[in-house]
């Protein structure tokens, strides 16, 4: 055993291991980098798939909102039925009611204002009422054609939007982008999936090959160090020398194999890189179509906001009409109460007139009784004077004995009610 040979073995093993470590480290870094790119691409495909699935659901949701929320509930039930039919009919009804009541009041003569001396036209009950809010509903009904035109315009926009969402967005763009995704990246394209998995398996196998080579070179280097340390007995050392000597002869072939493995690594990385580049380009193109679809959704959102603004305007008109209907109802009720109270007032005037007549009758009867009593009193006075006047001096009851003035004074007035 030559110690110079041992030293040579150690140096050869160290150099080979060091060179191999540099090559393997560089190769492993490239493998890690391309695997990261592969993982990133696979993750981006999953995200793109999630986005497309989400957009399809959003498309269905948008279509449901348009058909049921806007088409059925808003346009048909709220606008066409509740506003243009029910509300308009109610306004027409109450406008007719209040107009009829005003016309009725205009035709009722105020009996209390009639005078025999007055030859002018008598006043009517309609002269005593306020007419400020009589035509509230007529004014609102004049606005209905404008509302009808707005609803008709929004219906045309709605129908156009439904057609675009259903035909262009859902049936065409979303369906097309879904089919393209499935064709290029989905389960329908097993070849593409298998290619990516095959690249990944090849790289994993090459990593194992590199690890085995490095493990073999490391073990050989450890044996040379053990041989150099001389800590084993001569027989074992002699046997170890033969093993190391044989392995040293294989270093060239092992290093050659390492280069071949690294060449395979480089080829696989190159092929995988080209594959990813092509797939990323396809994904980018598909993502551009998805972005265009998202822009379509944003435009549809703006249209929905327009529907909301129009709905708010119509709701405001509806609420205003409802308030005017309530005002008109209250005014109709007031006119009814006014007419009823006028009727009661006529009865009250008649009652007062009857009372005045009764008072006049009573007073005339009283006056007649007083006159009779006064005549009787005059006769009694004359008889008294005739019998007693000669004997009574004037001073005994000054100014009274021969006073024939009436004992009563009656002055009354009954007002004409």
From Swiss-Prot:
Keywords from the named record: Autophagy, Coiled coil, Cytoplasm, Membrane
Keyword Cytoplasm attributed: yes
Principal cellular location given in the protein's record: cytoplasm
GO cellular component: Atg1/ULK1 kinase complex; phagophore assembly site membrane
One GO term (biological process): piecemeal microautophagy of the nucleus
Membrane topology: Peripheral membrane protein
Entry annotated with the keyword Ion transport: no
Recorded family membership: Belongs to the ATG17 family.
Subunit structure: Forms a complex with ATG13, ATG29 and CIS1/ATG31. The ATG17-ATG29-ATG31 complex interacts with the ATG1-ATG13 complex. Forms a complex with SNX4 and ATG20. Interacts with ATG11 and the conserved oligomeric Golgi (COG) complex subunits COG1, COG3 and COG4.
Protein name (record): Autophagy-related protein 17
